[in-house]
Amino acid sequence: LLTSCGSNAEKNPKLQDPTAQTGTNAGPGVVNEKEEDEASEKAGGNAGAASTQETVITNLSDAFTGETTASAKYAAYSKKAQEEGFPQIAMLFKAASASENIHANNHKAVLEDLGATIPVVKPTYTVKTTQENLQDAITGESYEISTMYPEFIANAKSINSQLALISLNYAYKTEQKHKVLYDKALAALQSNQVKTLSMQYYLCPTCGNTYDVMPPKRCGISMTNSEKFIQIEKA
């Protein structure tokens, strides 16, 4: 779906166009990104009544608010993990925070393209223990990948809003990666194996895709060349 939307992305310089070449994903602890296309198609096919552009704008505004809040919250969770002596988990939250910011900026770019007003967001959240923060993150990601983004993607697809589909799919697929990483981190924390977690992450600047291992030549979601990736090394 995303590669077929590439020509539309070129019309909006704020939403980076994926490189149109075939790429594969690699590395342990990540989901199979090729199979995620089937999930996206399934989500798109569940649209009920025909959505209007107003519905899509509302969805994008909600997604922008959610991603902006998540970015700020994960940054705070990173600081808390560092304070509690879990630098590896602090790194994960720092990477996730940067990734969510990419999603927020993509959603914002589409809203601007649609002539919509950008919401003013004042993030509110509660910082607890690192274990509780991980559980909160897992709950949030689970909601986004099981309910929120599938619904938003279906609405955008029903009116063929291509830029919205690109931005929403980027976030939807990346959040699946984040949930895997959070599940892995929580299991490591509960089994006293935190030091086995990665201390460096690689982010795709186009879609926010997050790798805890050396990434492949191209992003498994947007096909962006990994030479452009953002490396997160210090919390």
Where are these regions (language model features)?
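Non-heme di-metal
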Residues: 6-235
